[in-house]
């Protein structure tokens, strides 16, 4: 999330966020897209943010500025509770959307359809629902970025995140991104990676779709039906 505009920059479904290379890849992709890095990067204290923090400090290693947030000071760890902007957003998301998904998966557990300790079940759940989850996240992100945020106790500046992000001068502010060259970003690519696709489970699930003439589910009902069908095949 951009600190000034509160615009969501990326919102991605991944197998796990414990691998620091995964969030680092999202951070680096954003730097490439913008051609620059933030003046200051703030993250919680989880070890998964270590590589992104190191990249930020490297990009700003030679900088000097009046705010004294260059070099190693260009990244700051803070507790989740202290980062009110992003914590407020996660609260918004949970109230308005994620509780629905959580309830769905809990119901699957309660009805004996999903066993959390079963690798096949978890991989099948990912295969059947991950694209739908990502589509849902994209809609939530786009809605948030295009709606008007009301004035709050944490920020006197308010408006539409997309407008604030792309037109900061309209709010008497200026673009603060620090230029990063293509050469610099290429040097960092070795330190991050996207999610690894093509597991044996996924190959099998794709085989089932192909041999039975099925298509990837486009609705939650279709995803649940496919999930139950694949699990049933394995139990026969």
What are these regions (language model features)?
Residues 2-154, 207-236:
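RNase H-like DDE/DDD metal-dependent nuclease/strand-transfer catalytic core used by mobile genetic elements
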């Amino acid at each position: 999330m951009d600190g000034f505009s509160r615009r969501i920059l990326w919102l991605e479904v991944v197998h796990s966020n414990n691998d620091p290379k995964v969030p680092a890849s999202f951070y680096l992709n954003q730097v490439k897209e913008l051609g620059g890095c933030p003046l200051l990067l703030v993250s919680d204290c989880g070890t998964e943010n270590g590589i992104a923090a190191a990249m930020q400090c490297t990009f700003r290693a030679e900088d000097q500025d009046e705010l004294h947030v260059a070099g190693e000071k260009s990244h700051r760890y803070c507790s989740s509770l202290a980062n009110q902007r992003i914590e407020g957003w996660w609260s918004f998301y949970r109230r308005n959307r994620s509780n629905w998904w959580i309830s769905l998966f809990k119901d699957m557990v309660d009805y004996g359809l999903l066993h959390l300790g079963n690798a096949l079940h978890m991989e099948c759940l990912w295969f059947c629902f991950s694209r739908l989850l990502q589509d849902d996240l994209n809609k939530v992100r786009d809605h948030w970025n295009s709606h008007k945020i009301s004035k709050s106790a944490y920020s006197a500046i308010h408006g539409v995140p997309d407008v604030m992000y792309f037109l900061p001068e309209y709010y008497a502010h200026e673009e603060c991104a620090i230029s990063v060259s293509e050469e610099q970003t290429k040097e960092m690519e070795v330190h991050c990676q996207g999610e690894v696709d093509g597991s044996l489970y996924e190959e099998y699930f794709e085989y089932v779709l192909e041999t039975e003439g099925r298509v990837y589910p486009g609705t939650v009902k279709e995803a649940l039906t496919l999930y139950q069908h694949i699990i049933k095949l394995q139990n026969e």
